[in-house]
Amino acid sequence: MKNLKTIGWVGSLGTLITILAFSGSGFRNQLPEPVIEKSGLIRNEGNFYYRDLNKNGKLDVYEDPRQPIENRIQDLLKQMNLEEKAGMMFYSPTRVNKDGTIEEEPAKDFLATMSPVGVTEMDKRHISHFNLFSVPEPDTLAIWYNRMQKHAEKGRLGIPITIASDPRNQDAGGFFNMSAKTFSIWPDPLGLAAIGDAKLMEEFANISRQEYLAVGIRQALHPQVDLATEPRWPRIAGTFGEDATLSAKMTTAYIKGYQGEKISEKSVAMMTKHFPGGGPQKEGLDPHFAFQKGQVYPGNNFKYHLIPFEAAFKSQTAAIMPYYGVPMGQKDYEEVGFSYNKSIVTSLLRNKYHYDGVVCTDWGLVSDAKIGNLDFPARAWGVEKLNKEERVQRIIEAGVDQLGGENLPEIIVQLVKDGRLSEHRIDESVVRLLRLKFELGLFENPFIDEKKAGEIVGKAEFMKAGQDAMRRSITLLKNDNHALPLATNKLKIFVKGINPKVAAEYGMVVTDPKQADIAIIRLKTPSYPIPETKGNPIAGFFHFGDLDFKGKELDDILALEKTVPTVVDIYLDRAAVIPEISQNAKALLANYGASDAALLDVVFGKYKPGGHLPIELPSSMEAVRNQKEDVPYDTKDPLYKFGFGLSY
């Protein structure tokens, strides 16, 4: 083969770049520096530089970025064996060693017990999709990521890995958010919806995209576009509220900010969830657990919950994740979990909406899990009697491409060998999965610049943008006699739920409310243990139960309000029921994840509140119990209506 040479990693980086740029007279392409530095497979054919992923000494179609993606997919598909195809169809959790190494070591924490080591999964099961839970600092994560890609490069076909994550830019304590750590911190998605500004939503997504790319996260297990039509549901904070039009608007901007106009090497691919809408949960319980398998539609409002997904389809979301729930009382849909449900995945999603992107299940539909000493049964609702092989077969026959939180490719291999699934059906899913990897540019440049990770993640301008959004999202619900804004450094203030050191920058902090001119307190929407969660510590992480304050907790709040004029701020991760607190407060504000400084900047007039309620606040628990789980803003005589918000 003419002018074929392998370029080893020898000498300085500058020398290597010079070799690549100027060797031969017909230079045509320049490889990105991370590939130059990290890849051991760079070759030159006719002065065209590429990665010889299958190590056969020649330029294959799938290795050639000049070729159409569909041609590259078909070339690679022909070279893959059944085991490699099956491995593509699983999204396995993985853990990151704190020192950035990729070698297997004993699990040391709660989340690590759920997460096998990535290199083991690559070597034994050909898995190339991994999602992260807890992670180390950005620079360490970047080192780990490059080492993982380097290991993937050594595989028979050199197929790069894809790393995914749940949201990492909120830190309000939501169970479904990964800790922001050094990532820029923003209000919950509910707070961004309270602002309602599509340009700001796109800005947030673009900033988060840059941070994700800096550490190698190429797929986001969000946005969550469920409609918050049931006030008691624990997952409201991750939504854009209960209004379908607002949610669709936010969804469009969100996807554009992460993916761009089309998916490219600069994109983070979206996995929009939870199709066909996870909001209408009976009494606000959640189908993560066996005590609540079915979604209910007493208002016959199934189609309303599809509206945000229609916006996601128009925005070309890379992937869709169905929820765990079972559609109850819907004549067109079988009463089995959505990912097991061919009428949902094939008839509705594939055929009606002509969606040809990736469909990935929510996590843990096939295998029972053991988390520490806790048993966590598979969410195989409606098909509990099926064994693992039958569950996997049922999911794939429903039209799903990928199984989240599982690592069972050997089952797919056996199903094909037994004639229960065709390899052609497996190929359909693998084509979609490969297409996304190619579109993301992972076959050309899977590596990142480790030196830039710490510079990009959480940089000052990103942090400032997040703090500004927190301030802007704060929603003023009551301002008796224009009590707000308060005068800075002129008042004695009593605070509760606020760091006194932060408060001291705004006034003289006193410990006795009777000596204060004003009290400022921060509350969180209540939650209570329910009988169904008894003996289930995992369910205890979910905020279930009534939405109103009770007993001594309520008495103490009301007593304070009667002792001193009180400014009340409440964090809304669900729709709080606070009529007595509102009535007695001098001023009332709502937040959706905001720092003490962001709140006090608004209270003391450095910034104006700009939020409007993305969910209504009911006036009583009776009204909550009487509303219909699938219908928006339908509680009787709400205390504060959807869209309400004051300013000054």
Role assignments for model-derived ranges:
Residues A237-T239, K331-K342, A460, N499-E505, ...:
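Short glycine/threonine-rich loop-to-helix capping motif typified by GTGT followed
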Residues F443-E444, I448-D449:
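Phosphate/pyrophosphate-binding active-site segments
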Residues F275, K282-F302:
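Binuclear metal-dependent hydrolase catalytic cores centered on His/Asp/Glu-rich metal-binding motifs
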Residues R235, A290-Y297, Q330-E335, A369-V400, ...:
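Short beta-alpha connecting loops at secondary-structure transitions
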Residues K2-I7, L16-N47, L53, A112-S115, ...:
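C-terminal non-catalytic regions of proteins with extracellular/luminal or membrane-system context
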Residues Y323-G329:
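Extended catalytic-interface subdomain
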Residues A172-S179, P231-I236, P280-P287, K331-E334, ...:
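Short acidic, glycine/serine/threonine-rich loops at helix termini
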Residues Q30-P276, L306-M321, E335-L408, L421-L442, ...:
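N-terminal beta-rich core of secreted/periplasmic extracellular enzymes
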